[in-house]
């Protein structure tokens, strides 16, 4: 999926994430040939960029002896923010399943950090994924959204978010 639009050199997102992972672990990458199978459609809102960033970091970790101790999942999540600033997509790619994620501001001007939890979901719930037939860049899709949200709509949506998380765990 998307092979015609994916870079095949050092600018490839998976390669950049792998190199960043090696740097974070202070490790030298071994020689390797990378072949990717892109099963997540690009430009459809399913998190292909987040998956590429997380996948690259996890691959670098797996190629370094003791990498699991040198690069924790939390560090993977936060390094991946350098490539994809959507912790919801990143946490889904890293942990799988249902996630609630958020950005935490340091208040000091340092980059935001991300955190995530994986609430228990009732086992009878089955996810449904709808894939649009045509792609659209995330920046363009978000560009058509209003910069302001009505206060009552925001409050309503916030209350329903908590309700959704609760409801997904109930019989």
Protein language model features and the residues they cover:
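DPxDG-like acidic metal-binding loop motif
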Residues: 46-69, 94-99, 104
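ATP-dependent small-molecule kinase catalytic core of the GHMP/sugar-kinase superfamily
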Residues: 69-171
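Glycine-rich loops and low-complexity Gly/Arg-rich segments
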Residues: 23-24, 58-61, 152-158
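A short glycine/serine-rich beta->alpha loop
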Residues: 1-8, 38-47, 80-87, 147-152
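Generic beta-strand or strand-like secondary-structure segments
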Residues: 13-20, 55-63, 75, 79-82
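ATP-binding N-lobe of GHMP and related small-molecule kinases
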Residues: 1-44, 62-70, 106
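A general structural signal for well-ordered alpha-helical segments in protein cores
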Residues: 11-18, 53, 127, 138, ...
């Amino acid at each position: 999926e998307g092979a015609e639009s994916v870079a095949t050199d050092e600018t490839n997102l998976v390669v950049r994430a792998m190199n960043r992972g090696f740097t974070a672990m202070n490790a030298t990458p071994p020689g390797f040939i990378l072949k990717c199978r892109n099963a997540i459609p690009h430009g459809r809102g399913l998190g292909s960029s987040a998956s590429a960033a997380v996948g690259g970091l996890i691959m670098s970790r797996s190629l370094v002896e003791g990498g699991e101790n040198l690069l924790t999942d939390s560090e993977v999540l936060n390094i991946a923010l350098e490539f994809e600033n959507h912790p919801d997509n990143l946490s889904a790619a890293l942990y799988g399943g249902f996630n609630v994620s958020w950005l935490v501001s340091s208040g000091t001007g340092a980059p935001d950090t991300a955190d995530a939890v994986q609430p228990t979901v009732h086992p009878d719930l089955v996810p449904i994924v709808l894939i649009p037939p045509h792609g659209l860049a995330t920046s363009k899709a978000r560009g058509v959204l209003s910069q302001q949200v009505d206060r009552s709509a925001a409050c309503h949506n916030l209350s329903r978010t908590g309700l959704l998380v609760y409801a997904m765990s109930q019989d």
